Structures are given as C-alpha cells and as structure tokens.
Amino acid sequence: MCYFISKKKGLGGFFLKKNENIRWQQHFLYPLLFHNDFYVIDPNLLFNSSPSFEKIEKLPNSFRFLNVKRSIKLLHQQNYLVYNTRSSCFNFIGKTFFFCFDIFVSTWWKHFFGFKVTFKEINQQVNFQSVFSLFLFLEEVFMFSLSFSNIRIPSSIHSELLIRRFKFSIQDVSFLHFLSFILFSKQFKFVNNSIIFPRGNVIFCFFLGNILLSIFEDFFTLRWKSCFHEKSLSYGLFSEQKHFQQKWNFLTRKPKKKDTIRLLKDFFFHYIRYGEKLILLGTTILVKKCEFFFLNFWQTYLFVLSEPSSFFLKQISSQNIFFLAYYLEYPTNSFLLRLNILDYFLSTDFVGRELNSKLSAVFVIQFLSKEGLCDIMGNPKSKLAWLSFTDNSILDKYDHFCRNVDSFYSEAINKRFLDRVKDILFLSCIKTLACKHKSTIRIVRKELGFELRKIFVRKQVEFKNKKLLYFCFHKQFRKLLFKIDLVTERLWFLDILEVNNFTKFWVKQQNALDFFFIFDQNIWFMLDQFL
C-alpha cells in the first residue's frame, strides 16, 4: 500500500490518495518530494506573514517556482548531484527539500484531523482547548489512569548509524543512497562523531528518528502480548518456579468482579509520540515498565550495545545503571514542558521530568576501587597487575586514563572532585613504579618528574585548546533541542576504564583475520613451488 500526492481541482491544495494497484512504488519514499505537482502551491504562502511558519527561516530572494521545477529536472538527470555538489544550485536544492518536507508534514497532520487541505486557510488560527480534542481516546484514559510520565529522548544520532539501521527495514537502495547524500552534505556539521543540525533541519532529524522508533515499537508490542500468553517458561532456580506456579494458580482461580477489572486494567497503556516528546498513560507499574523499555532502547540501538547480564532494572531507583561504556543515572528533575505539536495549534503547559546524567563522586570511587587503583575510602594504591609491564607502557596506560578524565568527566562532575580523581591516578602511578623498581616514592618522583608532569599537567591545557567534545552534545544544539536552561549543561559521557574492552576485542579480530590471510597466502605459495 503506497501513498502519493496529487492535486485536486477546486481546493487549491493537495491531499494524500491511497492506491493499491501501483506496487512498483511500494518501497520508494523519497520520490514523493520530487513530484512537480507538490510544488504548485500558493506563492503567497512564502512571501506573506503566516503565523504557522514564523519559525521557518526566510528563503533567499532567488526562490522562485520556476527554479524549483528546473532543480527537479536536474535531480532526475543521472549523476547530476555527484558531479555538481559545489554549484550554487546544490544549496538551493537542499533548502527547497527541507522547506517542502516541513509543508508535507504539516499538510499530512492537518488532513489527518479532518480539515480541508488548502494552504490559504493556514493563516486562520485553529483553537483547541486541550490535548483531548487532538487525541480523542485521551478523554477516557486520563480519568482512569493512575499516573503519567513524560520522557524527552535526545535525538543526537550519528548519520552513519541511522543509515545502517535503515538497511534492515527499508529495501529501497536508492532511498538509502539519497539519505546518506543528504546527511553527509555541507548543511550538516560533524564535531567528533556527533552531528549538529541547523535550525531548519531538526524536523527532518525527528522524522528519521520516529521511523526507527516505530519499527521497534512493533517489536515491543509483540513481545508485550506474548509475555501474557506464555505458559512454559525456563527457570534458573526451583524457588522461582514454585513462586510462579503459586501466582499462576492465584490468577487461574475464579476471581471476583473487582479482581477481573483490575487484572484487565493493568494490561493496557496509551502513549503519544511526536518529535522528541513522549507521553505515557496508564497505571504506575506499566509506566515504569515503558520507561525502562525506552531507556534500554535508546542506550542499545542508538549509541552502544548494552550487556544484559550487567543491567538490572531494580537498580534504577536506587543507584546508577552501568552499561558497557555508559553510566546512566535515573533520578529525574522536574521542569515545565510546553507541548506544541504544530504551529497553528495552541500549546499546552504541564510539568514533566528529565533524565539526570550527573554522576556522583561515590560511584566513581567505587569503580576505581574495583579496578585496583584505590581503596573504598579513595586512598591510592599500586596496580600490582601491571608490575610486569615496562615503564613506558605503564605511563601510557595512566596517560590514557587522564585523557579520558579530561574529555569525558569535565562537565559530569565537580571540578574539585575532578582534581581529586587526577591526584588518585597520579599517586597510583608513582606507587606502581616504586613497587616495580623496589624504591621509594620520592626517588621515582625525582627521576620521572618531567614525564609525570607532562602527563598529568599539560594534558589539561591541551584539551582546553582543542575543545574536544567526543560524545557530548554541542552547546548550541543542546539549547536548540531542549530549549530549557536547566539541561544545557547535561551530557552523556563514557566510562574511562571499560572503553578499552572494545578496542581489545577489535584488535583480536583483526589479528585473527590477518593470521588466516597470511596462512592462506603461504599455502598457495607452497603449492606453487611443489607443482
């Protein structure tokens, strides 16, 4: 089933028409925006002041519909964009694409709510009293819901990761090439593996993210239904099996009317998702389960792969969650959220919650103590496992720790505690070298004073000059995304010790591949000589 855009006489606008006969367009998404009929809109829309398009940047004076038609013809030509990326028409095509994409989304939403799709009526303000008029099922759900939750998921997704995820769901190769071409164009800026979108292109980023999220929502609903219809389960302990049988016997007995109502009520939940906003409605247990799902989804599929064995949902309410390379703190901060689905709808204000990614000092000390760099109280000690290494390798390891501390923990913890962590690493390095050479700390400090100062002091100035960001959100992009002063300094940061496991695993794989390649070459060389 495919949707395409066509013009209807008498309305002066466009509508979505359903056609089941045209099957060759089933896997093609991007040609929707390159039909000539789509751009035959009212010229007064661009040049008159419209309250629904106040936030859109004004296009240059050279914007004309004849130029749009010419650019469409150039797009249909083979390999035009590949050889003419430096031309002035390339920037014009990009601006036209995102502007028409914004109109396309607004038109579809207005058609969905049952209005006449005429661009002349966009100037008229459509007033709604609440969100209930937009989503009718909320009138019944809000009254009987025990709790609701609001989650704002960041949308800083790397473009290459987006394209790889789309390969599993979209079979259209031309759409993937076109998507990669747009994301790697000059309109986007990349700062150390993080993409920064301009102001007018945030809607396009939300559109791609919502497509990915809808795919995993379908998978989540199937798993949600199967867990209630599952009869045979695998158990790790006999007590778990006995406890499950008791609960199952309690549910299968003939319940009263009140029990049946409560039992059926816990199975359903409702939510709204638009852009980066997500509103969950239901009982308290279901809301918590959905929050866990979306947190796990964000960390698993959009940043790094999580390890299920080290992830426990019961730890969320009490302490931080430790992923393979991330620390996530679940305690939330309340803030005032303004829900504005479209520009011509009234905004609704209500209090929501945000994820707090600030890390406390206790968990860092505990993690350093597990690695053997200090004790539970924070007193540094020597790393006995590194005594067999050379002095240069030991200094390189501590150098790597200090680099990651400056880059990842500069805004996550207080500056005073950051200096404390560096002092722990500094004294641990000296004690390790002193234990290896069987000397005192004072002698090691005199002999290696210059190299230690080069590692633990000069790296701060070096990182301040380069302004390395890595996986942090850019400051301007954070303000644009959240639009709240409280979260502009929040960031997601990597762990400084577990990152090496990724590189070690990758090096082992590369060494194994090189070994088999050399072994294969030697076999063919021996066969040639033998023959």
Curated annotation (Swiss-Prot):
One of its GO terms (molecular function) is RNA binding. It is found in: Plastid, Chloroplast. GO terms for cellular component: chloroplast. GO terms for biological process: mRNA processing; RNA splicing; tRNA processing. Its main location: plastid. Keywords: Chloroplast, mRNA processing, Plastid, RNA-binding, tRNA processing. The keyword ATP-binding does not apply. InterPro entries: Domain_X (IPR024937), Maturase_MatK (IPR002866), Maturase_MatK_N (IPR024942). Coiled coil: none annotated. It holds the Pfam family Intron_maturas2. Belongs to the intron maturase 2 family. MatK subfamily. This is Maturase K. The lineage of its organism: Eukaryota, Viridiplantae, Streptophyta, Embryophyta, Tracheophyta.
